[in-house]
Amino acid sequence: MDLEAAKNGTAWRPTSAEGDFELGISSKQKRKKTKTVKMIGVLTLFRYSDWQDKLFMSLGTIMAIAHGSGLPLMMIVFGEMTDKFVDTAGNFSFPVNFSLSLLNPGKILEEEMTRYAYYYSGLGAGVLVAAYIQVSFWTLAAGRQIRKIRQKFFHAILRQEIGWFDINDTTELNTRLTDDISKISEGIGDKVGMFFQAVATFFAGFIVGFIRGWKLTLVIMAISPILGLSAAVWAKILSAFSDKELAAYAKAGAVAEEALGAIRTVIAFGGQNKELERYQKHLENAKEIGIKKAISANISMGIAFLLIYASYALAFWYGSTLVISKEYTIGNAMTVFFSILIGAFSVGQAAPCIDAFANARGAAYVIFDIIDNNPKIDSFSERGHKPDSIKGNLEFNDVHFSYPSRANVKILKGLNLKVQSGQTVALVGSSGCGKSTTVQLIQRLYDPDEGTINIDGQDIRNFNVNYLREIIGVVSQEPVLFSTTIAENICYGRGNVTMDEIKKAVKEANAYEFIMKLPQKFDTLVGERGAQLSGGQKQRIAIARALVRNPKILLLDEATSALDTESEAEVQAALDKAREGRTTIVIAHRLSTVRNADVIAGFEDGVIVEQGSHSELMKKEGVYFKLVNMQTSGSQIQSEEFELNDEKAATRMAPNGWKSRLFRHSTQKNLKNSQMCQKSLDVETDGLEANVPPVSFLKVLKLNKTEWPYFVVGTVCAIANGGLQPAFSVIFSEIIAIFGPGDDAVKQQKCNIFSLIFLFLGIISFFTFFLQGFTFGKAGEILTRRLRSMAFKAMLRQDMSWFDDHKNSTGALSTRLATDAAQVQGATGTRLALIAQNIANLGTGIIISFIYGWQLTLLLLAVVPIIAVSGIVEMKLLAGNAKRDKKELEAAGKIATEAIENIRTVVSLTQERKFESMYVEKLYGPYRNSVQKAHIYGITFSISQAFMYFSYAGCFRFGAYLIVNGHMRFRDVILVFSAIVFGAVALGHASSFAPDYAKAKLSAAHLFMLFERQPLIDSYSEEGLKPDKFEGNITFNEVVFNYPTRANVPVLQGLSLEVKKGQTLALVGSSGCGKSTVVQLLERFYDPLAGTVFVDFGFQLLDGQEAKKLNVQWLRAQLGIVSQEPILFDCSIAENIAYGDNSRVVSQDEIVSAAKAANIHPFIETLPHKYETRVGDKGTQLSGGQKQRIAIARALIRQPQILLLDEATSALDTESEKVVQEALDKAREGRTCIVIAHRLSTIQNADLIVVFQNGRVKEHGTHQQLLAQKGIYFSMVSVQAGTQNL
C-alpha cells in the first residue's frame, strides 16, 4: 500500500544542478563527449572497494532485500485481515452507533486484530533493523571508497607528465575533484541500497501476486511492459541531457576559474562584463539543456502516471469480477492488487537511483580514465637506474623537439651540446629560440622527439625519474612559492633539511636580512604563489630553495632576473660560489652575467650556431657579438662617463640583467593571492562559517519571483497531485464497502463506475504531473543560472582586499561557485513541487479523515510528530555535517589547486609525494563526516520506515475496537488509515530532503552574504565624476598605505610626488620599497590610509580631483598597464590583445598595428594559426618574452591617457628590447607615464626620476641632477654600470 511513497519516488529525479559536473578534458574531448555518453562498467565503479567495503555492501544488500520484501509480506497480512473484517463486521448491517461488543463476532474480531497487530509489529521491528543496516552500511562503504578515489585521482594527476597538462585543460581538474567525485559518491552510496530495496519489492510483490491470484496478476502485468518501456526511455533521455548539461557547466567553471585567477588583469582592463558574458553564455546553454530535460522527463512521468491509474482501473474492474464470481475473496484481490502495485511502483522508486548510478558511471569514466592513464615519464615509478655517484657530464646528441600541444612547431632542430662535469655553460639567444626548452628536457619534463640527452654517458631515460630530478637544482625565470611559510618553502628543496642548513642557504642567497626584518621571520606566510613578497624577495627564496638541495647539476633560467641593484651583485657572487664543482647551465638575456662562463653557446632557430668563451666568440663576430653590441649600447648610461672594460665590473653588472624586471611580483602582488597570507597550505577555514548570517528560504525564492506564473501553475498542479491520493483512498474504501451483502449486478455496475473514475484520474494526472515537473523544473533552472551569474558578478565586483583574504583563494571561490548554486537548486525547483504536493496530500487526507473518523485520526496523527521530529533531528545533524564537509573539502581543494596550478614547480622539486600526503591528510575530515552521516541517516531513515508498520498495528487494533463499539464502519477505518498513512509517508519523503535542505540553507547564506557585501571600492559603481577633459596630472600628497592583510607592515609612509601632463616619471629603488604599490593605488585596487596624526589629510590627486571622487571605471579606462608578470587568457592571441579595450569591438587592423608596435607581429606570422593561435592556460604556450610583448600590445590598443609600465620590457631578449623600448618611447609621447625599472639604463631619459626608500621619496630629479647629487641613485647606477669611478 506504499502508493504515495512510490509516487514520490517516481516524481523525484535529479535536478540539473545535481548533474553539475565540471569536466576536465580538452575541448576536443568535450565536443566528442557531448555527442556520445561514455560510461564505465557497473562493477568497475566499485573497483576501489576492499574486503571490508565488500562486506558492508553485501550486508547492506541483504538487508535492503529484506527491507524491500517487507511491504509485499505486509500485504498478505493486510489481505487476510480485510477478509476477517468483511466476514466478521461486513455481514452485519448495523447503524454506526450500534455496538458489536456484546456479540460474539465482536470479541472474535478484536482477538484476530490483536494477532495481526503482532504480525505488523514483528515486520516493523525487522524493517527497523534492516533499514538501518541497509542505509548506514552502503553509506559507510561509499565514504571509504570515495576517500580512496579522491586519493587515487589526485595521485594520478600529480603523476601525469607535463605534456599531458599542456594538452588537457587543467583549470577544471580541481572542480572535478569535488563535483565529479561527489557524483560518484551519490551513485555508489545509499541509493544502491535503495535500488536493491526497490528490486526486492518488485520481485516479492509479483511473487506474492502469483501465489495469491495468478489470473489477476497476469491482467495487471499486461500493462507493465509499457510502464517499463516508458521508464527506460525516461532514463535514457535524462542521461543524454545530463551529459550535455555537465559539459556546459564544465566550460562555465573553466571561465570562472581563469577570470578569478587573473582578477587584477580583469579589473585593470575593465574586463568584468566580458568575463561575465563569457560565463553567462555557457550558463545559458546549460539552462536551455536543463529545460529540455525537464520537458522530456516530465512527459515521460505524466505517461507513467496515466498508465498507473489505467492499471488501477483494469485491476479493480477484473478483480471485482473475480470476487463477485467467488473465485477470489476480497482479501485475496486486495493482496494481489497491492502487491503488484507496490512492485510496479518500486520501479519508479528505482528510477532516481538508476539515474544517480548512471551519472556516477559517466563521471567515473573520465576520472578512472585519468587514473588509468600511464604517463611515459612517471615520477612515481621506482624503475630506472639510481647510481651511487654522478659526475655531471651532460651531452645533447642531435636533439629534435616540439611541444605536444603544438606538434607542428619545431623548437629544437638538431641540438648538439657537450658540458663537462663542473663546467658552466651559458645559453644565449633571442626569446623563444629554445633555451628554456633545453632546461626542461634535462629535467625530463618532456622527452625529445629524436636524439638523446646523456648524463655521464647514460641516456637520461634510463635513470629513475625522481632520482634524476633530485640531482638537479632549478631556479627559473618565474619563481613559484607555495602558500606556506618561508622556512617550509625552502624545505621543499630537500625534505630532511635542518634549520641551520636553511639559514646557510638563505644567507648565500642574500635573503637573510629581509627575512629577519619580518615580524614572523622564517615563519612568515608568503601567500598564494608568494604574493606577500616582492619579486626580488621571491627570487632569493627560490635561489635558497635550490641551494639547500645541494644539486649535482644547477640550472639557472634567469635566476637573478628579479633582483634590485643592491642585491644582484651579492647574489651573483653567491651563485658563482654555488656553481663551484657543479655542472651549471645558465640562461641569461643580460650577457654581462655570463662573461665568465666556461662555454657560451649561441642559439638561433633551435640549434647552437656557435660556442666558445666570451673572448673567442667576440672574435668570431657572430650571433653573440651582435647581441653584446646591441646590449652594450643600451646599457651604457653615458659612454664617456662609464667604462666597461673591467672584467670584474662586467660580472657585477650581472643579475639585474635583461629579465631583471620580469616576474618581480613586487609588493604589488599583495594581490589577490595574499589570500593565503594568513594560513599556509594547512588552511584553517574556521572563519568561513563563523559570521554567516542565516537566510530565510523565502529570501531565496524571491530571486525566482519573475517566474511567478510558473510557480502558480506548478503549485496548483502540485496541490491537485497531492489531492489525488486522498481521492484514491475514498474510492478504495467505497470499493471495499461494495463487497458486503447485496446484489451482484449492482456490485458490478458500481465497480465499473469506479474503474472509469480511476481512468479519469489517470488522464488528469498526466497533465498535472507534467505541468508540475516542467514549471518547477524550468523555474529551478532559471534560478540556478541566476544564482551562478549573480555570484560570479558579485565576486568580480569585490575590491582587492577581499581577494587578499585567504578564504577567497581561486580554488575556494571556484569550488563555491560550482557547488553553492547547485545545492540551492537541490532544495528548490522540482523538490519544492514535491513538498507542495506532499503537504497538499497530508492536508487533504487529514480533513477527510476527521470527517469520517476523528478518533482514529487523532491516534494516527500522534505518529506524525514522531516522524516530523525524526526529520528535524536528521536535518539539524546533517546541517552540521554539511558545514564541516564543505569546509574540509575546500581546504583539500586549496591544496589540490595550488599543486595543479604550479605543477611544473612541484615536479621540478620532486614534491609530488609531499602534496599528495597533505591532500590525503585533509581527506580524513570528509571521511569522518561520512561515517557520522551514515549512522545519523541510517537511524532516522529506519525509524521513518518502521513507523508505518507500527502504525498499521495500532490503527487496525484500535479500528477493530471502534468498529466493535459502533463508532466507525470498516470502510471508514480503511479510508482514514490510507489517507493519513499515505500522507505521513509523503511527509517522510519531504523530510528525506533534509540533507539537501540543510546544504541549501548554508549555501544560500554564503551566496547572500556575497551578494550583499558592499566593497570599499565598487568596480560596478556609477557614482563619481567623469570629467570631459582629462590631462593626466598626478599628485601623491603625504600618502600612507599598508596592505590590509599585513596591517603592521608599513609600505608607503608619507609619500609625496607630482607628475605633470605628458611627463615620464621613473620610480627606482630596492625590491619591496613600494614602487608597484603606487601603480596599484593609481588603479584604485586599494585606497590609501591615514597612518598617523601627521597624515590626516593624506590623499591622492588626479587633475586636482581626489581619485576617490572620480568614477572608478572611468578612472581605470584612462590607465594602460603593462605589469612585470603579464597574465594572458586561454584564448587566441588576437583576443588577448583586444582585451586591452573592453569598451568596444577592436578591429583586426588595430590588433595587428598594436602587435607591430610591440614587435610581436613577425613571430605571430610564423605560427600556423597566426593571430588565432591559442596561448594556453596563463599563456604557457609562449615564452616569457613573447607573453610580455603581447601584454604591451594589449596596453597600446587601449590608447590610454596615463601609461603604467611596471618592468614592461623585463622579459625581452636583446634583439627585441631595443625595438620595444623605442615603441614604448613612442607610445609615451603626449601621455603621462610612470615607469618602474631596475635596469636604470631604460629610464635615463625620464623627465623625473624618484628614488624610493622605506616607502618615502629619498631623492628626485633628472638623471643628470641625481648623478650630480652622488647619493643613492648614483650608487645604484655605479653598481649597474660596473664601476664606482665616475
UniProtKB/Swiss-Prot annotation:
<dbReference type="Pfam" id="PF00005">
    <property type="entry name" value="ABC_tran"/>
</dbReference>
<dbReference type="GO" id="GO:0016020">
    <property type="term" value="C:membrane"/>
</dbReference>
<keyword id="KW-0547">Nucleotide-binding</keyword>
<keyword id="KW-0472">Membrane</keyword>
<dbReference type="InterPro" id="IPR017871">
    <property type="entry name" value="ABC_transporter-like_CS"/>
</dbReference>
<dbReference type="InterPro" id="IPR036640">
    <property type="entry name" value="ABC1_TM_sf"/>
</dbReference>
<feature type="transmembrane region" description="Helical">
    <location>
        <begin position="333"/>
        <end position="354"/>
    </location>
</feature>
<feature type="transmembrane region" description="Helical">
    <location>
        <begin position="119"/>
        <end position="139"/>
    </location>
</feature>
<keyword id="KW-0963">Cytoplasm</keyword>
<keyword id="KW-0813">Transport</keyword>
<dbReference type="GO" id="GO:0005737">
    <property type="term" value="C:cytoplasm"/>
</dbReference>
<feature type="transmembrane region" description="Helical">
    <location>
        <begin position="218"/>
        <end position="238"/>
    </location>
</feature>
<feature type="binding site">
    <location>
        <begin position="1071"/>
        <end position="1077"/>
    </location>
    <ligand>
        <name>ATP 2</name>
    </ligand>
</feature>
<dbReference type="GO" id="GO:0005886">
    <property type="term" value="C:plasma membrane"/>
</dbReference>
<feature type="transmembrane region" description="Helical">
    <location>
        <begin position="51"/>
        <end position="73"/>
    </location>
</feature>
<dbReference type="GO" id="GO:0016324">
    <property type="term" value="C:apical plasma membrane"/>
</dbReference>
<feature type="domain" description="ABC transporter 2">
    <location>
        <begin position="1034"/>
        <end position="1279"/>
    </location>
</feature>
<dbReference type="GO" id="GO:0042626">
    <property type="term" value="F:ATPase-coupled transmembrane transporter activity"/>
</dbReference>
<dbReference type="GO" id="GO:0006629">
    <property type="term" value="P:lipid metabolic process"/>
</dbReference>
<dbReference type="GO" id="GO:0005548">
    <property type="term" value="F:phospholipid transporter activity"/>
</dbReference>
<feature type="transmembrane region" description="Helical">
    <location>
        <begin position="973"/>
        <end position="994"/>
    </location>
</feature>
<feature type="topological domain" description="Cytoplasmic">
    <location>
        <begin position="1"/>
        <end position="50"/>
    </location>
</feature>
<protein>
    <recommendedName>
        <fullName>Phosphatidylcholine translocator ABCB4</fullName>
        <ecNumber>7.6.2.1</ecNumber>
    </recommendedName>
</protein>
<comment type="subunit">
    <text>May interact with RACK1. Interacts with HAX1.</text>
</comment>
<feature type="region of interest" description="Interaction with HAX1">
    <location>
        <begin position="625"/>
        <end position="647"/>
    </location>
</feature>
<feature type="topological domain" description="Cytoplasmic">
    <location>
        <begin position="140"/>
        <end position="188"/>
    </location>
</feature>
<dbReference type="GO" id="GO:0061092">
    <property type="term" value="P:positive regulation of phospholipid translocation"/>
</dbReference>
<dbReference type="GO" id="GO:0045121">
    <property type="term" value="C:membrane raft"/>
</dbReference>
<keyword id="KW-0597">Phosphoprotein</keyword>
<dbReference type="Pfam" id="PF00664">
    <property type="entry name" value="ABC_membrane"/>
</dbReference>
<keyword id="KW-0445">Lipid transport</keyword>
<keyword id="KW-0812">Transmembrane</keyword>
<feature type="transmembrane region" description="Helical">
    <location>
        <begin position="297"/>
        <end position="318"/>
    </location>
</feature>
<dbReference type="GO" id="GO:0045332">
    <property type="term" value="P:phospholipid translocation"/>
</dbReference>
<feature type="binding site">
    <location>
        <position position="536"/>
    </location>
    <ligand>
        <name>ATP 2</name>
    </ligand>
</feature>
<dbReference type="InterPro" id="IPR003593">
    <property type="entry name" value="AAA+_ATPase"/>
</dbReference>
<keyword id="KW-0988">Intrahepatic cholestasis</keyword>
<feature type="topological domain" description="Extracellular">
    <location>
        <begin position="211"/>
        <end position="217"/>
    </location>
</feature>
<feature type="glycosylation site" description="N-linked (GlcNAc...) asparagine">
    <location>
        <position position="97"/>
    </location>
</feature>
<feature type="binding site">
    <location>
        <position position="1046"/>
    </location>
    <ligand>
        <name>ATP 2</name>
    </ligand>
</feature>
<dbReference type="GO" id="GO:0005925">
    <property type="term" value="C:focal adhesion"/>
</dbReference>
<dbReference type="GO" id="GO:2001140">
    <property type="term" value="P:positive regulation of phospholipid transport"/>
</dbReference>
